[in-house]
From Swiss-Prot:
Keyword Lipoprotein listed: no
Protein name, as recorded: Large ribosomal subunit protein uL3
Ion transport in keyword set: no
Pfam family, one: Ribosomal_L3
Amino acid sequence: MRSQLSLIGKKEGMMHVFDKNGNLVACSVISVDANVVAQLKTASSDGYNAVQMGADVVQAPEKTIEKRFSKALLGHFKKSGGRVCRVLKEVVVSEEAVQSVSLGDEFGLEIFDGVSNVDICGISKGKGFQGVMKKFGFRGGPKSHGSGFHRHAGSTGMRSTPGRCFPGSKRPSHMGCDRVTVKNLEVVKVDLDRKVMLVKGAIPGFKGSVVVVKRSCGVEG
């Protein structure tokens, strides 16, 4: 049942490796330190079954930790052994999975040993306020000097009926900083000594951003 758990990691960047056939494969490097079970939720007490995982344990004197974190958080972490984590993520699991773990348990990349495919969830890179040509791939207007518009969206309405633009149409707006999940990425290598995982292809986020790694649904590892 521990296969239902997700791990919190950090995107370290990308690199190239050679596969068994001699092909050069682009891989994303994810570092995963020990994840701590910070809270257990059950259907009887919370309405659903879930496991809250914590990562990036704070290494600082006790007095410093008391100044930086609220008493509510310190009391929350005290129930799981007192290790304060900077990142908390919740994973919805089955009732059997909740019963198979305990508060304060630590998990690492060993739960992905032998897994062939994983799903990576993270926050995509922010690109600021963008126009419709960059965000949606609009063609734009004529490029000649006499044109009145070059990168505008153009007309998005109709005639006198309905006499308005329907809500939800494509407009210039903020781009990026979205929660993105890339599914079914191939696991190239799991290095337990260095606590890193190599997955084929790109994953969302910038270098140093937090990602969540979980076993792909419907794929046997």
